[in-house]
Amino acid sequence: LIVGSDTYPPYIYLNNDGVPAGIDVEIATEAFRRMGYAARFETIDWEQKTNLVESGAIDCIWGCFSMDGREEVYRWAGPYMVSRQVAAVDADSSIRTLGDLAGKTIAVQSTGKPEEIFLSGSDPRIPQTVEVLSIENRSVQYALLSCGYVDAIAAHETGILQYMKDNSVEFRILEEPLLVTGLGIAFAKNDTRGLDS
């Protein structure tokens, strides 16, 4: 089965040998093995994930993928894990709460849950004056924060912690999460193979 994913350490990334590795790779490999399948991982254009799974170019989307708000878009297996979507700032920043983001700039991954949360304007904790910078390549948002080009970033907490560890960078994660979400495996709505069960 072809598993489509973006790189998102520690969930899925290429190890030093260029081979997919990470939490999701281990879980997917074992789950599909138990079902009698071998998993083959392909890095995809994350913005095209729905088109790729619906067209059959990939069998599923698996890679730290939040189920919340997408229940009707895909056929889901999961959740297999719970994750916190959070905002992070420079360690010395005066920003302490989501409300402190008023008039500030935050970088998020395009098509991700944080982008949806910030752009929807539906969360009363988030000021309407936050400027949202949507980035296709997730790793760029970390660099933007490190260099001071943005005031904050938002992503899965585990991903932020992994980036800090791998790059010896000190960010401060805000205490209040944007969202606590279940992570799942997304199949096309018209997929009738029963792989989601």
Locations of the language-model features?
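Periplasmic-binding protein-like
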Residues: 6-7, 81-89, 157, 161, ...
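Soluble non-cytosolic domains of exported or imported proteins
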Residues: 18-26, 43-44, 108-112, 135-139, ...
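Ligand-binding cleft/hinge of the Venus flytrap
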Residues: 13-17, 28-38, 77, 113-135, ...
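Extracytoplasmic small-molecule ligand-binding "clamshell" domains
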Residues: 1-65, 72, 132-135
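Short, solvent-exposed loop/turn elements at domain surfaces
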Residues: 9-15, 70, 96-97, 116, ...
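A ligand-binding cleft/hinge motif common to bilobed small-molecule-binding domains
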Residues: 48-54, 62-73, 117-121, 143-179
